[in-house]
């Protein structure tokens, strides 16, 4: 009988980074419509923003409610730089404007971080919440810099074109964002391998022990925040180039909350978690918001579900399944897995149908007798649609509960075998 052999899950860094680069190159060519390019641009900037936020939360254990301060102020400095370039007062390649945002974010990280990182835990979170509200309130007090309620607009097509690149067409902006995303991702991954990256992990896990062996945890938090603010500023600079307008919303608590939600959904315990979270989050806020008025409800439910049942985020679900696949147990798991997924989706279909009908009845189109649900005309005023919704939920929930126990037993048995084999190999 063949015995299991354990090897660490390592896809090979060259393969991973090469695949990531190819994805960034070919994604704009495959999804080439105007709406798709705009969506890719927003995903790219949010990926950098999420990775920078995860330097604080995932690696340093610092829950910040004010990270938008650094990306937003970086965006304001970037848009002012574009306006200076347009007026002839400054010469700088547009491709380097994100660096202006990065250095602006770093400067404010040095200024604000010295105060906020004096404390850790809940106190740090509350200070950052107060900071973001302070900066947001200041945006209305200094209209010459923040532009008041209308914000500051600019034009990214400035200066001479180089090799036909003017950054006027959206696809050129997408590739600019992709290039910065690749560079920033490499830089932030490299940070995790440095002594500072290891030490901030130690300060997160056991600050008392880190201080006992001679390290100042406040300075570790401070230096990490400065670097995080730099990359957040770069994301803000790219956002300014993409939208050509920056407003007070860029420095608001709403944007800080958005990056927190997206990063947590993706997975704060994995480096690539924020990348997944940015894709899911931007898709929900941009595409879903056009399809349904209840998109915020769905986003909130997804966040609650992740917090309760998958604290490691989507990334942890992928890695756990990858481990099962690596050890050759997926054939044993698959029959249980697809059943529980199908029954869960069936129950959720009934819930979503009820939610959409409620929103339809409470909206401005109450007089409309019909609505479309996945392309099918239904009548929310009638009893039939509600019976179908209730039946879908009841049948799905019943089958889900029937499938849950066998799935949990199989999952536990498989993971017990994997742990036993790993311990055997380690001995």
Segments from the language model and where they lie:
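Transmembrane alpha-helices and adjacent helix-loop boundaries
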Residues: 1-427
């Amino acid at each position: 009988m063949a015995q299991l052999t354990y090897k660490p899950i390592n896809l090979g860094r060259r393969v991973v980074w090469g695949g990531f680069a190819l994805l960034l190159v070919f994604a704009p060519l495959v999804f080439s419509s105007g709406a798709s390019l705009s969506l890719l641009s927003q995903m790219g900037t949010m990926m950098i923003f999420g990775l920078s936020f995860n330097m604080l939360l995932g690696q340093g254990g610092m829950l910040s409610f004010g990270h938008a301060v650094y990306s937003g102020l970086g965006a304001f400095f970037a848009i002012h730089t574009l306006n200076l370039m347009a007026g002839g007062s400054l010469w700088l390649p547009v491709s380097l404007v994100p660096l202006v945002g990065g250095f602006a974010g770093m400067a404010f990280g040095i200024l604000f971080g010295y105060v906020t990182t004096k404390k850790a835990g809940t106190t740090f979170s509350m200070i950052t919440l107060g900071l973001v509200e302070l900066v947001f309130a200041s945006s209305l007090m200094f209209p010459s810099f923040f532009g008041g309620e209308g914000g500051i607009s600019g034009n990214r097509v400035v200066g001479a074109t180089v090799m036909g690149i003017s950054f006027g067409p959206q696809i050129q902006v997408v590739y600019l964002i992709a290039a910065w995303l690749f560079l920033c991702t490499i830089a932030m991954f490299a940070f995790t391998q440095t002594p500072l990256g290891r030490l901030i992990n130690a300060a997160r896990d056991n600050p008392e022990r880190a201080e006992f062996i001679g390290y100042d945890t406040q300075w570790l938090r401070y230096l990490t925040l400065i670097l995080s603010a730099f990359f957040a500023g770069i994301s803000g600079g790219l956002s300014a180039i993409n939208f050509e307008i920056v407003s007070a919303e860029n420095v608001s608590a709403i944007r800080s909350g958005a990056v927190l939600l997206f990063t947590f959904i993706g997975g704060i315990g994995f480096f690539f978690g924020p990348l997944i979270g940015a894709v899911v989050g931007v898709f929900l806020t941009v595409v879903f918001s056009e399809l349904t008025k209840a998109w915020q409800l769905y986003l909130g439910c997804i966040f609650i579900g992740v917090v309760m049942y998958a604290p490691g985020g989507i990334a942890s679900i992928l890695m756990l399944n990858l481990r099962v696949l690596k050890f050759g147990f997926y054939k044993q798991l698959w029959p249980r897995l697809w059943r529980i997924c199908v029954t869960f989706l069936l129950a959720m279909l009934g819930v979503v149908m009820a939610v959409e009908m409620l929103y339809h009845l409470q909206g401005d189109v109450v007089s409309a007798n019909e609505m479309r649900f996945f392309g099918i005309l239904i009548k929310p005023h009638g009893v039939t649609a509600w019976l179908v919704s209730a039946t879908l939920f009841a049948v799905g929930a019943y089958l889900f509960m029937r499938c849950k126990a066998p799935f949990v037993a199989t999952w536990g048995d498989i993971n017990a075998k994997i742990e036993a084999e790993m311990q055997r190999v380690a001995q």
